[in-house]
């Protein structure tokens, strides 16, 4: 009997509510908020729990990407598909990333969240954002592109650099496909290795409530809910704009491609709560790759689109950058002409590519953008430093949802989406087992 048969039978029996991961994570987040609010010092001391969980997940990201991409590409009958999938993915990323930037710009002009602050730029303390500005100055388009090529294969895996691992995985998968039958033993080994690797993912996810509790307790304990009140207009505008983007823009994309955004959100609810609790979309990357494959997207598409999307398809970060930049300009009474705003948009399009899916990366990317746009003072970032952590959750969630949608859409464009399997998955009736080619027989 196959392991898949056993797991499929087990999946048919619904777990009680308290045993479901999304409920456990939701309870953990709530307890973390309460602890951080009423006992801030204890809440701050919970930080290692969140950090440890993220390190555990990052530990397996590189091997999961390598196995998924290498086996997916090596199993392709037509290697030209690799180029087509990559091209369609980049077209999607460029289109919707630019749209997210434009939406942030338009909303900031209409709502004017920074109006009325009347802050003199000369009084701003730039020392609080010097660290972020220094990191931002290290970024350049050439440096970013060169960094995709790893110095050594071992170094790429040791550092956990997603794009470097993806670059090597694609080349290895192509080479494995080109050697034909001689590569069959290697391909079989890698496919067999995927079973314990995905099992490890599910084991680590059981610790998600602990990680979410620690991260949320630290955030509330250190920054306090009260820090949001003074900048509630900015935070509220950002959350509302992100919701608009997810449910209207991405919702329309989903509907056009034959599925519902609400059904997709229900399907990935455990991962969404994990991202909410940790403020890191990377925390749920391995689990998302597994779920997208179970939802009917071919492994080759999943392996290419998701890791690439974590650098090139950051819708939440893009909305945040134009919205935050205009907020700073409005708060310091700096008028930005249409030309200035177009320059801001173009610079943001470049600097947003390569922003990692980790906590705080959006703030560094904003610093990189403002350092090139002379009209808006980088020191103005001090105004939003206190609430950036509370916007980080929304950035990460929007980025995560955007990549889930992108994977299914690109798979459908390429004819690599099993729509019947997707319908079952979104309806909650799918067999929650490993793909057939990575399930060992007895």
UniProtKB/Swiss-Prot annotation:
PROSITE patterns membership: NA_DICARBOXYL_SYMP_1, NA_DICARBOXYL_SYMP_2
GO biological process, one term: L-aspartate transmembrane transport
Cellular component aspect of the GO annotation: plasma membrane
InterPro entries in the record: C4_dicarb_transport (IPR023954), Na-dicarboxylate_symporter (IPR001991), Na-dicarboxylate_symporter_CS (IPR018107), Na:dicarbo_symporter_sf (IPR036458)
GO molecular function, one term: succinate transmembrane transporter activity
Residue spans crossing the bilayer: 20-39, 52-74, 89-111, 141-158, 162-179, 200-221, 231-253, 342-364, 368-387
Keyword Cell inner membrane: yes
Membrane protein topology class: Multi-pass membrane protein
KW rRNA-binding (keyword) present: no
UniProt protein name: C4-dicarboxylate transport protein 2
Native organism taxonomy: Bacteria, Pseudomonadati, Pseudomonadota, Alphaproteobacteria, Hyphomicrobiales
Encoding gene, per UniProt annotation: dctA2
């Amino acid at each position: 009997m196959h392991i898949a048969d056993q797991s499929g039978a087990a999946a048919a029996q619904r777990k009680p509510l308290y045993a479901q991961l999304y409920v456990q994570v939701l309870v953990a987040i709530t307890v973390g908020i309460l602890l951080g609010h009423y006992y801030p010092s204890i809440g701050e001391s919970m930080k290692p729990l969140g950090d440890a969980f993220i390190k555990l997940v990052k530990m397996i990201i590189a091997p999961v990407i390598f196995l998924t991409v290498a086996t997916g590409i090596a199993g392709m009958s037509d290697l030209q598909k690799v180029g087509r999938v990559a091209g369609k993915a980049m077209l999607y990323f460029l289109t919707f990333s630019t749209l997210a930037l434009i939406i942030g710009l338009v909303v900031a002009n209409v709502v004017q969240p920074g109006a009325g602050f009347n802050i003199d730029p000369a009084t701003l303390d730039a020392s609080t954002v010097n660290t972020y500005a220094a990191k931002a100055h290290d970024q350049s388009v050439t440096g970013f592109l060169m960094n995709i090529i790893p110095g050594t294969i071992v170094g790429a895996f040791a550092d956990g650099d997603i794009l470097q691992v993806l670059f090597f995985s694609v080349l290895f998968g192509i080479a494995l496909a080109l050697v034909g039958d001689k590569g069959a033993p290697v391909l079989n080994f890698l496919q067999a290795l995927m079973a314990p690797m995905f099992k490890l993912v599910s084991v680590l996810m059981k610790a998600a409530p602990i990680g979410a509790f620690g991260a949320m307790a630290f955030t509330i304990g250190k920054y306090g809910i009260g820090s949001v009140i003074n900048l509630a207009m900015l935070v509220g505008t950002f959350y509302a704009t992100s919701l608009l983007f997810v449910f209207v823009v991405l919702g329309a994309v989903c509907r056009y491609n034959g599925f519902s955004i609400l059904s997709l959100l229900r399907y990935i609810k455990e991962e969404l709560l994990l991202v909410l609790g940790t403020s890191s979309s990377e925390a749920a990357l391995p689990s998302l790759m597994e779920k997208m494959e179970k939802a009917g997207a071919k492994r080759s598409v999943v392996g290419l689109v998701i890791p690439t999307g974590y650098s090139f398809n950051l819708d939440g970060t893009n909305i945040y950058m134009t919205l935050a930049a205009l907020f700073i300009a409005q708060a310091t009474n700096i008028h930005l002409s249409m030309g200035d705003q177009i320059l801001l948009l173009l610079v943001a399009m470049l600097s947003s590519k390569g922003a990692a899916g980790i906590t705080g990366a959006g703030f560094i990317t904003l610093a990189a953008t403002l350092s090139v746009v002379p009209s808006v003072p980088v020191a103005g970032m001090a105004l939003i430093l206190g609430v950036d952590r509370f916007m980080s959750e929304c950035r990460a969630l929007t980025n995560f949802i955007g990549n889930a949608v992108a994977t299914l859409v690109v798979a459908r464009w390429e004819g690599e989406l099993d729509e019947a399997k997707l319908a079952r998955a979104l309806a909650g009736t799918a067999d929650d087992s490993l793909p057939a080619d990575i399930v060992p027989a007895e």
